[in-house]
Amino acid sequence: MVNVVVTGAAGRMGTQIVRLVAAAEGLKLTGAVERPGHAGQDAGALAGIPPLGVAVVDDLAGALAGADVVIDFTSHEASARNAELCAEKGVALVIGSTGFTPEAKARVAAAAARIPVVFSPNMSVGVNVLFELVRQAAKVLGDAYDVEIVEIHHKRKRDAPSGTAVALGEVAAGALGRDPADALAYTRHGILGERPPWQIGVQTLRGGDVVGEHTVYFCGEGERLELTHRATSREQFARGAVRAAGFIAGKPAGLYDMADVLGLRSAR
């Protein structure tokens, strides 16, 4: 049995993860963490299911006793702090937060030298299949096709572009032998001249209640290939995170992603 702690347990993602962990074979919810205001409430009741006998606390350190894995959907600042605490306690970690700064990523990487960490910009199984499709398409189509990425999310999303859009650009750039730092273009405005052939554009849209949509365009002469993933609910992100928790328990220290969880890396 894998003992799981969920951070952000009263949020939209957290409540879904609590429900899925409670229903999952081989997993047991042993801790739930949320900001002050929810402490003492039963995690199951907060998630809309029968009580689980797990009281919400407002400090991760107080929930780690006996834990095997923490599933973290908070913020990049909180996730970096939580990674350091999990490393101190020897508890594996699944991170689904986005919007990481280079400094926060470095803190997570340092923690992964001591514990196993699944760190992925998107926990959806479908999106991770999209990563592989983009990699293969870029290799086959090569420099003869221009690559552009468009993402749209709900108006409350704080970071832009999405971590998934950036990752898609990095995947395409890597497959084409380009440095993402040079190739990815996030802003276009004014008279810029002809599009550089090495460039990969990443465009952001925000509005309404869109859960998430990503399209990668491969634009050639006389044809265009579009690869799209549309999320219609957040449940697929939660399902991926719970799957990652079952995968990472007992693994050696290191930085893993959903390609490892889904066995996609070994299939390349």
Curated annotation (Swiss-Prot):
For this entry, the protein name equals: 4-hydroxy-tetrahydrodipicolinate reductase
Q: Where does (S)-2,3,4,5-tetrahydrodipicolinate bind?
A: H154, G163, T164
Q: Which residues form the active site?
A: H153, K157
- Gene3D superfamilies found in the cross-reference section: Dihydrodipicolinate Reductase, domain 2 (3.30.360.10), NAD(P)-binding Rossmann-like Domain (3.40.50.720)
* Cysteine pairings via disulfide bonds: none
Indicate whether NAD appears among the record's keywords: yes
Gene Ontology molecular function, alphabetical: 4-hydroxy-tetrahydrodipicolinate reductase; NAD binding; NADP binding; oxidoreductase activity, acting on CH or CH2 groups, NAD or NADP as acceptor
What keywords were assigned to this record?
A: Amino-acid biosynthesis, Cytoplasm, Diaminopimelate biosynthesis, Lysine biosynthesis, NAD, NADP, Oxidoreductase
In the record, the note on similarity to other proteins reads: Belongs to the DapB family.
Top-down, what is the taxonomic lineage of the species of origin? Bacteria, Pseudomonadati, Myxococcota, Myxococcia, Myxococcales
Pathway, per record: Amino-acid biosynthesis; L-lysine biosynthesis via DAP pathway; (S)-tetrahydrodipicolinate from L-aspartate: step 4/4
PROSITE patterns to which the protein is assigned, alphabetical:
DAPB
Subcellular location(s) of the protein:
Cytoplasm
Q: In this record, what's one Pfam family? A: DapB_N
Alphabetized HAMAP family for the sequence = DapB
Class of this enzyme = oxidoreductase
Which GO biological process entries does UniProt record here? diaminopimelate biosynthetic process; lysine biosynthetic process via diaminopimelate
Annotated NAD(+) binding lies at G8, A9, A10, G11, R12, M13, E34, G96, S97, T98, S120, P121, N122, M123
What does it catalyze?
(S)-2,3,4,5-tetrahydrodipicolinate + NAD(+) + H2O = (2S,4S)-4-hydroxy-2,3,4,5-tetrahydrodipicolinate + NADH + H(+); (S)-2,3,4,5-tetrahydrodipicolinate + NADP(+) + H2O = (2S,4S)-4-hydroxy-2,3,4,5-tetrahydrodipicolinate + NADPH + H(+)
| Residues the record lists as binding NADP(+) | R35
Superkingdom assignment: Bacteria
According to its UniProt record, the EC number is 1.17.1.8
* A GO cellular component annotation in the UniProt record: cytosol
Q: What does the protein in this record do? A: Catalyzes the conversion of 4-hydroxy-tetrahydrodipicolinate (HTPA) to tetrahydrodipicolinate.
